[in-house]
Amino acid sequence: MTTIVSVRRNGHVVIAGDGQATLGNTVMKGNVKKVRRLYNDKVIAGFAGGTADAFTLFELFERKLEMHQGHLVKAAVELAKDWRTDRMLRKLEALLAVADETASLIITGNGDVVQPENDLIAIGSGGPYARAAARALLENTELGAREIAEKALDIAGDICIYTNHFHTIEELTAKA
């Protein structure tokens, strides 16, 4: 699996992910970019799960964003509907964390679109560790979203064998 974490604070939203790809219990690659920008750099997204499946979902999600003029929630709901009802898509195994200036969402293959409490997302095998670390930092420090995401990924990478210390980080800043 992997670890993807998203943190929102003080007008900034970050999605960060590690770079480890495994096949069974073997590390196949250590610098996979699991976080990317979509829809003219207005949306950021990260994935946990099968790499090929995730890239298929990124492509489908970007099409949904274009169909709905960048409206994140509508695009996410439409992707989740298709993912749940299409026989071929149902076989895809991945989770997506997506965010724009105003919303952060988790999209699952079960058709769920979840807006998490405190706009804190952590998915993948290291997700519970990253979530705990990020929550503690959000509640007890004045660190920015990027620093919190980096530290949360570092902690997850120290604990989870499927998470490494190669990070890809994308950030959006809300327009004033």
From Swiss-Prot:
Allosterically activated by HslU binding. InterPro entries: ATP-dep_Prtase_HsIV_su, Ntn_hydrolases_N, Proteasome_sua/b, Proteasome_suB-type. It is found in: Cytoplasm. Coiled coil: none annotated. It comes from the Bacteria. Signal peptide: none annotated. GO terms for biological process: proteolysis involved in protein catabolic process. It catalyses: ATP-dependent cleavage of peptide bonds with broad specificity. Na(+) binds at residues 157, 160, 163. Its EC number is 3.4.25.2. The keyword Hydrolase applies. Protease subunit of a proteasome-like degradation complex believed to be a general protein degrading machinery. HAMAP family: HslV. This is ATP-dependent protease subunit HslV. It comes from Salmonella gallinarum (strain 287/91 / NCTC 13346).
